[in-house]
């Protein structure tokens, strides 16, 4: 069972009835996608009182700089980045939306002239991804990843946090990282998911006030 944090205790009870076999259950309680499913690892262990527990703390996907930054968003104390260094995370504040669009287009141009395979431009919702894709596709070669998408393509992809979960990109641009879009504890989980999709390079871009979910 993958993404254990997204299942409720009731759903686990159903799984146990349907599949009374040994199970391996994996997940990350820092990555909730459903705000109504907020329970703890202790709650899960009560459902499996005789289970063996192993905590995997080493993060191999992202650079040291990206994981260190992500821990400023979600305080996952036990998470240990590998000693693979890269660029510092970029936080870009724009005067208006037009400047924000231009910055994203420049990020796409830099990606296309580099040697990386996949750039993810990640929005908070599917609706926001569709809107941004509609603007970018007039000037750039970009893909849109939606619930209806059947496969993942390299290149530039615009998608939501929901659809990006489980994916990884060489580079990530988090769109609208402002204090209106990301402001609640649940938003903290979403922003953490978005940031940890990046393997080598992470940029957060916004207009207005930067989200307050990034700790000093």
List the predicted regions and their residue ranges.
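Conserved helicase motor core of SF1/SF2 NTP-dependent helicases
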Residues: 5-216
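Walker B catalytic carboxylates
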Residues: 2
